[in-house]
Amino acid sequence: MANHSSAKKAARQTVKRTLINKKRSSAIKTFIKKVAHEISLGNKENANLALSVAQSKIMQGVKKNIIKLNTASRKISRLSKQIKSLNESK
């Protein structure tokens, strides 16, 4: 356990930041799942709307260092590709 007051404060801050980061990470995953759900249902319009919201949340995660830029780009690219194939197939 931390003995110095600065170390105790750092430990408190770490706990607080960890909770915030987990919340943000969970929110990003939830928005990605919403897009995947709309794609599985075949709703083009809803999938596009969900993608725009998810893309915004993913990029906010990049800005807050929750996920890396390349990871975010890969996720957005794969979701966009699925929606594009959905649009072409129907």
UniProtKB/Swiss-Prot annotation:
- One Pfam family cited in the UniProt record for this chain: Ribosomal_S20p
Q: Which UniProt keywords apply?
A: Ribonucleoprotein, Ribosomal protein, RNA-binding, rRNA-binding
Q: Does the keyword rRNA-binding apply?
A: yes
The yes or no answer to whether the keyword Transport is present is: no
Gene Ontology MF term list:
small ribosomal subunit rRNA binding; structural constituent of ribosome
Q: Which GO terms describe its biological process?
A: translation
State the family it belongs to. Belongs to the bacterial ribosomal protein bS20 family.
Function comment: Binds directly to 16S ribosomal RNA.
Q: What is this protein called?
A: Small ribosomal subunit protein bS20
